[in-house]
Amino acid sequence: MFDAAPIKKVSVVIPVYNEQESLPELIRRTTTACESLSKAWEILLIDDGSSDSSAELMVKASQEADSHIISILLNRNYGQHAAIMAGFSHVSGDLIITLDADLQNPPEEIPRLVAKADEGFDVVGTVRQNRQDSLFRKSASKIINLLIQRTTGKAMGDYGCMLRAYRRPIIDTMLRCHERSTFIPILANIFARRATEIPVHHAEREFGDSKYSFMRLINLMYDLVTCLTTTPLRLLSLLGSVIAIGGFSLSVLLIVLRLALGPQWAAEGVFMLFAVLFTFIGAQFIGMGLLGEYIGRIYNDVRARPRYFVQQVIYPESTPFTEESHQ
């Protein structure tokens, strides 16, 4: 029997970026799901610098009578995980659930996550069944999940699904972390004592397009590699050693062949020498790029700039105000 504290209030955190078409339905379905809980609840919508009317719709929802919606407006786009962290800093619940705004993960799954967390788990992840994504998105997700499992040793099936539940101590601990590159599911699992996963439905995206383009997925993979482990640096050292030994061996071989076969053979081997040279130069540039990625992240962390700036927070039945402090 787990000895976790009882859950008295649930907070649902939803980052929003240009989701004006899905937002009314999202609010309706999420509110209905939360009303079915036998606990207090709140919904936090975080506008991540949307250029459409998402922010206006959020503010209107917060100002309705008997609203449970808190709207947090960031001054520009900072990315999905930064927006979620901004929401975490304003929650008041004992259990915090994250949910995407595109309705591909049904809000109706929220009671199941709460019930599972009530069993004493610190983190409740989800695995999408019958994924309604493109082949490219599915393939990229499999690669990312495999990469995470290999580097962290945490065998969870679907790190890419943001429909997840976290107990408050996990959230508080994550808020004390100040690294710029934050991948919330992994960071939470680092601190979780008991974590589990449940299968959930996955629907097609009805409105708009995915906000994760090819380049954003590539950047995400770089983030995962460099923020999770220093193994690539060790592999780089190993690769450098192999190349150095190979280069020395090749040099000895070329000298022997030059002495055995004469200068004419050496002249005819110029192109091979250039090929070897370009191989070594390419390996050096790969290594320099990887080192630069790590150094750049160290530089960003040392500057300790805020990950986001909260422009306004609109609470239910209250007047909007501008925050002087930011995270």
From Swiss-Prot:
One of its GO terms (molecular function) is phosphotransferase activity, for other substituted phosphate groups. Its EC number is 2.4.2.53. It is found in: Cell inner membrane. InterPro entries: ArnC_tfrase, Glyco_trans_2-like, Glycosyltransferase_2, Nucleotide-diphossugar_trans. It is a multi-pass membrane protein. The chain crosses the membrane at residues 236-256, 270-290. This is Undecaprenyl-phosphate 4-deoxy-4-formamido-L-arabinose transferase. It comes from Salmonella choleraesuis (strain SC-B67).
